[in-house]
Amino acid sequence: MKLKTFLASTTLALASLASTGTQAAGTLTVALHQDPGNWDPIATFLVSWGAVGGQVFDGLIMRTPDMKLVPGLATKWEFLDKNSKLRFTLRPNVKFHNGEPFDAEAVKFTFDRLLGEEGKKGPQQSNYNSIEKVVVVNPTTVDFVLKSPDPVLLTKLAGYGAMIVPPKYIKEKGSQFFGMNPVGTGPFKFTEYKPKVSVSFERNAAYWGDAPKLDQLVYRFISEPATQAAELRAGRLDVANQIPLAMIETLKKDSKLSVISVDGPVALALRYNTQRGIMKDREVRKALTMAVDRDAIIKTILLGHAKPIASFQGALSFGNDPALKPLPYNPAQAKAMLQKAGVKPGTQIQLDFRGPDSNFREVAQAVAGYLQAVGVTVSLKPYETNVLLNDIIPNGKTGEMWQNQWGGWTFDYDNTAYAMYYTKQRWNPFDDDAKLNALLHMQRNTWDQVARKSTLQEISRYVADQALEMPLYSLNTIYGLNKRAKNLALPSDGRFRFVDATVD
């Protein structure tokens, strides 16, 4: 399903749920599978943060549910001096939730912080390293001075690390306090955070845009998809962002509920630890990939709510190469390749995965079964999600394989590939490949989108040839909904914006 088709069908589906009378307000309750643990925009990389961040923060640029870039805290922008400078005209008379003014100094503070020592502590800085500095022209005008081309910069300014933060508040309270008590310019104001339980917001009646219609917005952190489904059926949720695939048809039969499944940007793979044991051998890595029937996994476990991938990106990603095909499922050839490489039957490897993800647990079990059939014994190692993402992977403490899952929120392979394959990036604890580094630099340093797409496709082919990962699938974005919630904007990237939502 193409993105435009998804938007049209989603609009029709949601419109059919909407009442024709005066819309109510009330409280919208949303389940998220993960608590990011910190609400500071520069401290995160998680889709679950993006699902919340757009309620409390704004960027200079915003992205609509149909992925169009529109003015946010900036009313307009233009490239100057042969694309070496990006000038923003800022929206006047905007205030942060604590009352301090939004102006050019706030923009400069935000990016000085992101690009400075504070930004080094989090995963966002590398997304914005094309920016040399931000210069205040006047209170409503700023210039971004660029040290290199960045053809994805405008998109990246519409999310995550580029969200504008309040200088005075952070200077007075400190970054740690800010991370637990966020203040922005967004449509909802933070009221309470209970770690691993919930985060709550109230309506920002003074919002510079259309004021939200809801009185309250509550996110509950529910890691188990089955629990999300149970809470949805019990009427204690309005939106569930993860439900067991096996329960989709059951939920659809409930007259109070609906389920929407659309193409999404989330890609899943098993990344290989190329410095450990048998994984040092590229032919072994290829053999293991060929030993797993991904089509069968998609059909029997994911019930068709995913598509096979040949590289770590979905079909909606700029840079995806339709001509690149996954290695075929061929267990006999895989077994022969392992034997030729000297891998002894019964060789043991470890697969690390996100323990609370019951859907992927089944996938991991299936992978273990396929590898067992070619003589490789897999030990499944579940981790608390934040432990795996914040400690085990970035510190190079993984087993031979680990669950690699990426939201791909820019819908551009650049963001994914740089984070995954460039030397010493957070998600690349093991590999140091000069050719990959050069290709990644090349595509980031041109405004020529045709040339850039060609380079990105070359990167995906090279990664496949080196067998750095076992590409699995691109997962559909699936929402379970209570029909009492109306006018929901449900983008495929999971970054909610509930300005128009109401609850009967």
Give the positions of each predicted feature.
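Structural transition elements
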Residues: 188, 307-340, 357-362
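Extracytoplasmic/peripheral linker and loop segments enriched in polar/acidic and small residues
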Residues: 283, 377-388, 415-483, 504
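Surface-exposed binding/hinge segments that line
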Residues: 78, 89, 125-169
